[in-house]
Amino acid sequence: MGKSLDKQFGRFLRQQRGQESYAVFAKRLGISASTLFRLENSDQSVTLGKLEDILKRLKARMRDVFPE
């Protein structure tokens, strides 16, 4: 993904995580806590397949992350 899309996705993940710990939230998403941290901070891009998997686990839609 492009940098601006990575940032939008990172903000979305932070918002969804709320006060939940990285470890607990990452487990729900099927990723490691370190991967979650990197995604939230736009230090790692996500593949389309992993994005779809994460959204499914959160019961969210693509337009929830990328409204425009």
Give the predicted meaning of each segment:
Residues 18-38:
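Short alpha-helical DNA-recognition segment
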Residues 1-18, 28:
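A short, Lys/Arg-rich alpha-helix, primarily the initiator
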Residues 38, 67-68:
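Phosphate-coordinating loops and pocket residues in cytosolic domains that bind phosphorylated ligands
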Residues 47-65:
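DNA major-groove recognition helix of helix-turn-helix/homeodomain DNA-binding modules
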Residues 19-21, 46-49:
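Residue-level signal for the short linker/turn that defines the boundary of a DNA-recognition helix
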Residues 41:
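Short, conserved catalytic or interaction motifs in soluble domains
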